[in-house]
């Protein structure tokens, strides 16, 4: 019955898994999150109580273990929403090398108190996933797959 259905927002995503597969599909987030706005994918993935997330890919549906997600890439409105939250942050170009030899490049949006505004402070304070802003995209990188972070010069874009 639809009256018992929990309202959800459909968010198109591209996900890289730790086995090397890339899935294009739809994640579902709450229509109303903290502050009354729609829940964004970053906060959804950083929730600690849920270990699995549902993903719909065409006619197939998966339950993905968050621990096996290397990154989630957003485009369009969901990416603009997250990037919009970072307008007042200090933007630091970064190249993130991941386990398996993949690199992603973009901008870290650091919104921290002045005494903790270094990149290392930001990385150590991040949740399970951290946002990397790109041109028209936001890539949510799982911290446990990060090997190195350095200046954003010379990497291929995801």
Outline where the language-model segments fall.
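Conserved RNA-binding domains used in RNP assembly and mRNA/RNA metabolism
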Residues: 1-158
